[in-house]
From Swiss-Prot:
Domain of life: Viruses
Predominant subcellular localization, coarse grouping: virion
Cited function: Plays several roles during the time course of infection, including egress of virus particles from the perinuclear space and secondary envelopment of cytoplasmic capsids that bud into specific trans-Golgi network (TGN)-derived membranes.
Assembly and oligomerization: Oligomerizes. Interacts with UL7 homolog; this interaction mediates UL7 homolog incorporation to virions.
Organism of derivation: Elephantid herpesvirus 1 (isolate Asian elephant/Berlin/Kiba/1998)
PTM info: Phosphorylated.
Pfam families: Herpes_U44
Subcellular location: Virion tegument; Host cytoplasm; Host Golgi apparatus
One GO cellular component term: viral tegument
Entry similarity comment: Belongs to the herpesviridae UL51 family.
Matches recorded under InterPro entries: Herpes_U44 (IPR007619)
Covalently lipidated residues, kind S-palmitoyl cysteine: 8
Keywords assigned: Host cytoplasm, Host Golgi apparatus, Lipoprotein, Palmitate, Phosphoprotein, Virion, Virion tegument
Protein name per UniProt: Tegument protein UL51 homolog
Length: 321
C-alpha cells in the first residue's frame, strides 16, 4: 500500500508522477472551426495555413477560442432558466463572451490571410488576457449600457401599447353607451309628440255616420284631411261594406284621435265643418224617415286607447247626402 497524500488523503504509489491534462487541438479541429465559424472552404484553409508559422499561431489561439464558445453556449442555456436576480449578470456575461469570440475570429482570420504579424509573446499575452475571464472597465460599461437601453426601449413599447389599448376600449364604451341611450330618447320624442296631438282634438266614438245609396258599390271610402301644427296626413279610410236595402254602410272605421279634424269630406261633398274649438263633433238633425239601419260591431277608437262596444241593430239618425 502506498503512502497517503497529505492534501487530499488519497493513496498514491511511490514514484508516481502526475501530468496536467491539456486540451490538445489538431489541424482537423482548426479546419473545422475555420470552415464553420469563418465560412472558409477546406481548399482555402489548406492554402492559408500552408505557412507553418501561421499554423502554430492559430493552434495557440484555438483552445482559448473553443473554451469561450463553450461558455457562450452555457450562458445561452442559462439565460432562460436562471433566477430573476441573476438575469442581469448572465446577460452581461453573454455580451462579454460574444465580444471576445468576435475579436478572436478577427485575429484568426488575419493571421490565416497573412495580414497580421504578431509575435509569440503577443499571442501569449492575448491568450492570457482572455483566459483570465476579465475585460476592461470600458467593455463592461458598454455591455451594461446595452442592457439598460434595451430595458428602456422595452418599457416604452409596452407603455405605448397599453395606452393605445386603454384608449380604444374607452372609445368603444362611449359608442356603446351612445347607442343604448339613443332609443329611449327617440321614444320620449314620439311620446311627447303623441301627447301634444292628443290634446288638440277628440272624437265621440258613439257617433254613427251612415252613407246613403249614392256611393258606388264595390268601393266605399271616406277621405279625411287631418292637419295640425306639426304635420299633415292624408288618410284614406276604407272598410268592408254591408248591403242593406241597396245601400252601402260602413261596418268599421279607424278614427285617429291624436290629430285635429279640420275638414271632413264624404262622397267628395263637404257636409259640415266643425268648429276647431269644439272637442266633439255633433251631427246635424235629420229626419228619421230613412229605413237604413246601422249594423256595427266593435269600433276601435284611438281616443283614450280603449275599445268600446256599440249595441247591434241600433237605429240612429240618417244623414242623407
Amino acid at each position: 500500500m502506498g503512502a497517503i497524500c497529505g492534501k487530499c488523503l488519497r493513496p498514491y504509489m511511490a514514484d508516481t508522477q502526475y501530468e496536467t491534462l491539456q486540451n490538445e487541438m489538431d489541424i482537423q479541429d482548426l479546419q473545422t472551426v475555420m470552415s464553420y465559424n469563418l465560412g472558409l472552404s477546406s481548399g482555402d484553409i489548406a492554402q492559408l495555413i500552408d505557412n507553418e508559422e501561421n499554423k502554430i499561431k492559430l493552434m495557440d489561439i484555438l483552445p482559448t477560442y473553443m473554451a469561450y464558445k463553450t461558455k457562450l453556449m452555457r450562458c445561452e442555456e442559462a439565460k432562460d432558466t436562471c433566477a430573476e436576480h441573476l438575469k442581469d449578470i448572465v446577460e452581461t456575461e453573454r455580451h462579454k463572451l460574444q465580444f471576445i469570440i468576435k475579436s478572436l475570429e478577427i485575429i484568426m482570420f488575419k493571421i490565416a490571410m497573412g495580414n497580421l504579424q504578431v509575435s509569440d509573446t503577443q499571442i501569449e499575452a492575448l491568450a492570457m488576457k482572455y483566459a483570465t475571464d476579465q475585460t476592461t472597465l470600458s467593455d463592461l460599461e458598454k455591455s451594461l449600457r446595452v442592457i439598460n437601453e434595451d430595458r428602456k426601449c422595452s418599457f416604452t413599447l409596452m407603455k405605448t401599447s397599453g395606452d393605445a389599448m386603454v384608449e380604444k376600449n374607452t372609445d368603444d364604451e362611449e359608442i356603446l353607451s351612445g347607442i343604448e341611450c339613443g332609443t329611449p330618447q327617440r321614444c320620449n320624442v314620439q311620446q311627447t309628440s303623441s301627447r301634444r296631438h292628443s290634446h288638440r282634438a277628440s272624437v265621440d266614438i258613439n257617433q254613427v255616420i251612415v252613407v246613403s245609396d249614392s256611393i258606388k258599390e264595390g268601393h266605399v271610402s271616406r277621405e279625411t284631411n287631418i292637419s295640425n301644427e306639426d304635420c299633415v296626413n292624408n288618410t284614406l279610410m276604407g272598410s268592408n261594406g254591408i248591403n242593406l236595402g241597396g245601400g252601402k254602410v260602413l261596418s268599421s272605421s279607424k278614427i285617429v284621435a291624436s290629430s285635429a279634424i279640420s275638414n271632413t269630406t264624404i262622397n267628395k261633398q263637404v257636409t259640415f265643418k266643425p268648429d276647431p274649438a269644439d272637442k266633439e263633433i255633433t251631427l246635424p238633425d235629420v229626419p228619421a224617415t230613412d229605413p237604413a239601419v246601422l249594423d256595427v260591431g266593435e269600433i276601435g277608437a284611438a281616443a283614450g286607447g280603449a275599445k268600446q262596444k256599440v249595441p247591434r241593430r241600433e237605429r240612429s239618425l240618417v244623414a242623407s247626402c
